[in-house]
């Protein structure tokens, strides 16, 4: 029965020009979902906490920095760049979103990524190829940026690979959903775990090996902290491991996220998402002292090891299936309920004997998922250096909550900060409730709070905002 129903999805994918690899990958996701295998728990008594993870600072103090350039010269760089930023109201690649100014130029994510690559090439005298995993929706605009950048050149290594698409599935029937009002919404990406089959199908690994590259560093395009590092390249080479995940220490804000554990039977590392945690194990899983490390989604892989692993599975790795319950039109909760089937890139760690982790500081984990994150990134907490590093004093940021009614959409957000976001240098937390527009040179301090006035409101130029709202001058 499952096979018969799946054939409707396969036929739809063929009609739209999807490859056999894309169909094979989706077939596996679909069959796992229909057989309920995806709901298997990773029980607390089956795993051990991850302990004794070397830190970036320890690694930096112990490696041979001259030798590190040699390891770095054998490293290629891949950025996951398929996201549209729909959570912020964008209809284009999120990496085209302006982040901050540098020498009077407005810099987007993609500009900073290119700057990081060009700086590394120049300073260290290495090739450092950059490949972007784009989607059908992001490819055209992003490739135009790369091809019109007069300083960025690359031969023999492709600048992009295109991630697959799959049909959204009706939650009721298991059939591919139909949405004539906007047929594009009938499709979704298979999650960043799709990277592996896309790499296999594209021939990227062969191209890299032919040019003498041995290592591949992969990270998200919205994480500007995950820049190329000769220190980590040398450490990865020293370990001899086939696969390395950059992890970071969990904070209370991270307690509901996925974390890294070790399988008691196999000894292999595992990425355990909260959807894989049994209800009886939830307290243990959310205990950040017991399970102190989370996955930053930045990984290092040995090209030969990844190539061999993919060959053994015909290009489709058996990763745990994530089932996302949504509506076909994500902006309309009354539209048809659908299932989107995905896999996570970091889950591949469990397939490799000898995989390892390295603990990095928050300076290498600066994701921008919402306008709350962008608010901090655009503030005076950060300085974009000439090496295109997002630099902050301690990388301990204020807890920011902006009223989603007025700030979630990037166009609404920009309209309310016409002179840029306020100063956060003295802010411990920020809570803005209601429709507030900010003048020039506004400073937020302590636990800054603005309450909803029931109408559009304005913070004048040069004002201070603290726990009592806009503070009278004699209070400051």
Task: Tell where the protein language model's regions lie, with residue ranges.
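Short capping/connector residues at structural and topological boundaries
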Residues: 89, 93, 101-104, 229, ...
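Conserved N-terminal catalytic core of the sugar/cofactor nucleotidyltransferase
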Residues: 1-79, 87-215, 421, 426, ...
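Hydrophobic/aromatic beta-strand patches that form the interior of the parallel beta-sheet core
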Residues: 78, 97, 131, 160-162, ...
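Left-handed beta-helix
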Residues: 1-76, 234-476
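Conserved short loop/turn motifs at secondary-structure junctions
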Residues: 129-138, 221-223, 362-366
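Conserved core of the sugar-phosphate nucleotidyltransferase
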Residues: 127, 141-313
């Amino acid at each position: 029965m499952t096979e018969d129903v799946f054939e409707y999805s396969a036929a739809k994918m063929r009609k739209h020009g999807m490859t056999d690899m894309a169909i094979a990958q989706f077939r596996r996701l679909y069959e796992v979902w229909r057989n309920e295998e995806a709901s298997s728990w990773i029980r607390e008594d089956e795993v051990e906490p991850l302990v004794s993870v070397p830190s970036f600072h320890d690694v930096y103090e112990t490696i041979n920095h001259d030798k590190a350039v040699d390891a770095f010269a054998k490293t290629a760089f891949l950025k996951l760049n398929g996201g549209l930023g729909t959570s912020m109201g964008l209809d284009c690649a999120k990496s085209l979103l302006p982040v901050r100014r540098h020498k009077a130029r407005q810099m987007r994510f993609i500009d900073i990524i290119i700057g990081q690559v060009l700086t590394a090439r120049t300073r260290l005298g290495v090739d450092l190829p950059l490949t972007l995993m784009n989607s059908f929706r992001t490819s055209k605009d992003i490739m135009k940026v790369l091809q019109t950048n007069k300083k960025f050149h690359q031969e023999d290594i492709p600048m992009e690979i295109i991630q697959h698409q799959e049909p959204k599935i009706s939650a009721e029937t298991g059939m591919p959903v139909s949405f004539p009002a906007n047929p594009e919404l009938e499709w979704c990406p298979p999650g960043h775990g799709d990277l592996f089959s896309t790499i296999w199908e594209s021939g990227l690994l062969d191209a890299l090996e032919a040019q003498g590259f041995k290592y591949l560093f992969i990270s998200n395009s919205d994480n500007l902290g995950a820049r190329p590092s000769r220190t980590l390249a040398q450490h990865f080479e020293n370990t001899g491991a086939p696969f390395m995940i950059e992890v970071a220490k969990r904070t209370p804000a991270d307690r509901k996220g996925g974390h890294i554990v070790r399988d008691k039977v196999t000894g292999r590392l595992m990425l355990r998402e909260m959807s894989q945690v049994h209800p009886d194990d939830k307290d243990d899983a959310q205990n950040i002292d017991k399970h102190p490390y989370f996955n930053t989604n930045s990984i290092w892989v040995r090209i030969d090891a990844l190539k061999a692993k993919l060959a053994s599975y015909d290009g489709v790795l058996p990763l745990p299936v994530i089932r996302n319950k949504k509506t076909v039109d994500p902006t309309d909760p009354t539209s048809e309920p659908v299932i989107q089937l995905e896999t996570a890139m970091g889950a591949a760690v469990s397939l490799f004997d000898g995989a390892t982790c390295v603990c990095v500081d928050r300076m290498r984990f600066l994701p921008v998922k919402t306008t709350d994150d962008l608010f901090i990134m655009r503030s005076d907490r950060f300085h974009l250096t000439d090496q295109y590093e997002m630099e902050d004093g301690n990388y301990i940021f204020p807890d920011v909550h902006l009223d989603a009614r007025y700030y979630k959409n990037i166009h609404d957000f920009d309209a309310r900060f016409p002179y840029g976001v306020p100063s956060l240098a003295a802010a411990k937390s920020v809570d803005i409730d209601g429709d507030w527009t900010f003048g020039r040179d506004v400073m937020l301090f302590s636990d800054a709070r603005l309450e909803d006035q029931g109408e559009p409101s304005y913070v004048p130029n040069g004002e201070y905002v603290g726990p009592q709202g806009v503070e009278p001058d004699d209070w400051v």
